[in-house]
Amino acid sequence: MKKIVSIILTIFLSSITYAQEERISSTIDSTKSPELVLIQEFKVKAALDAVWNAYTTKKGWESWAVPLAEIDLKVGGIIKTNYNASGKIGDSTTIITHIVNYVPKRLITLQAEITDNFPEFMKEDAKDFYNVIYFDELENGYVNVKSFGIGYKNNTKYLSLMNYFITANEKLLLQLISY
């Protein structure tokens, strides 16, 4: 029965597109394995340098995403962020994201460290979670950003988590679009 429900959800969700605004497209897609991919895509009217810097510099992160950030931009580097303006980098609310690789102004692959602040069910799957982000410079001063959240399992807990991430990410990405 679980397998049938999982198959039905996979088929159903592979065709659903979520969008807070037309400016951000959020899609849950299935892969050949029992995993789901969260694809989020949007366009920003800004120079490629500015959008790349928004993702890869302290000033960039603190301009649109978080009040506190530290960045060590290199393969094997780390992005440390904190959504708590009263907190500090290194406290229990710091989010640590590893930079797996990058191609300047084209692509960055990230992997978040799963801490005690994440749901328990994610901890055993921590090695599977990646975010691959592509940056494409378009005509007329726009940049297309396409993010692939990889490693989500196709079950009820992860579907609920993905719905949370869709809403939270779209709100955050709207801040980047306005930045």
What do these predicted regions represent?
Residues 40-42, 68, 94-101, 128-137:
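Hydrophobic/aromatic beta-strand elements that line small-molecule binding cavities or substrate pockets
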Residues 51-52, 61, 79-81, 99, ...:
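Hydrophobic pocket/interface hotspot
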Residues 18-70:
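Hydrophobic ligand-binding cavity/cleft-lining segments
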Residues 1-24:
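Bacterial Sec-dependent N-terminal signal peptides
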Residues 119-166:
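Beta-strand/loop substructures that line and gate deep hydrophobic ligand-binding cavities in soluble
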Residues 48, 83-85, 101-103, 112-114, ...:
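A mature extracytoplasmic/lumenal domain signature
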Residues 59-94, 102:
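Short beta-edge strand/loop motif at the mouth of beta-sheet-based domains
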Residues 45-49, 73, 100-108, 134-144, ...:
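A short, structured loop/turn motif at beta-sheet edges
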